[in-house]
Amino acid sequence: MQSSPLLEHLIENLRCLPGVGPKSAQRMAYHLLQRNRSGGMNLARALTEAMSKIGHCSQCRDFTEEDTCNICNNPRRQNSGLLCVVEMPADIQAIEQTGQFSGRYFVLMGHLSPLDGIGPREIGLDLLQKRLVEESFHEVILATNPTVEGDATANYIAEMCRQHNIKVSRIAHGIPVGGELETVDGTTLTHSFLGRRQID
């Protein structure tokens, strides 16, 4: 039996979400149509509004409806002298939830990957360079992912910072809280040893 073309279209479009395959998309579509039509309509309105109104902050490149985001507009953060460089906007939310950072951000929207044609310009390093020249940061904290590409990106940015005599650091990577040593991979364990701190 052939399904409704509109239903097939809905299922196909739900598959654009990360981790959503054909079966998950079908379950979502049937759930919205059978049990939660008002939720589906609210979702459609929220998506339409977000897609048309949310852009990027002109300073940090995070998502915002304004020219500059709330973090960049915060005078306390403007005077902190701290800049944290992250790969994706979602990384800002993760860091903000810790409550441990009170500076400003710069979002790369990816990482260096020459094989994929992603060089310094594609991830906005020309814009970062401009900020390093025009603003007075005393420390840049690199919060790129602990991958080969993340490491290469961090090293490239670290060299940029050194050229401007700006202190540069990288967030530590290691064993998760509650993790057991026997289940941790060798690379993570190595980073844990290299990033060890003295106990006072």
Swiss-Prot record:
The UniProt entry, under InterPro entries, shows: DNA_Rcmb_RecR, Rcmb_RecR, Rcmb_RecR_Znf, TOPRIM_dom, TOPRIM_RecR
Q: Which Gene3D superfamilies match?
A: 3.40.1360.10, 6.10.250.240, RecR Domain 1
Q: Which PROSITE patterns match?
A: RECR, TOPRIM
What the entry lists under SMART domains is as follows: TOPRIM
Q: Which residues form a coiled coil?
A: none
Residues crossing the lipid bilayer are none
Q: Which GO terms describe its biological process?
A: double-strand break repair; recombinational repair
The record's comment on protein family reads: Belongs to the RecR family.
Q: What job does this protein perform?
A: May play a role in DNA repair. It seems to be involved in an RecBC-independent recombinational process of DNA repair. It may act with RecF and RecO.
Q: What is this protein called?
A: Recombination protein RecR
What is the organism lineage in this UniProt record?
Answer: Bacteria, Pseudomonadati, Pseudomonadota, Gammaproteobacteria, Pasteurellales
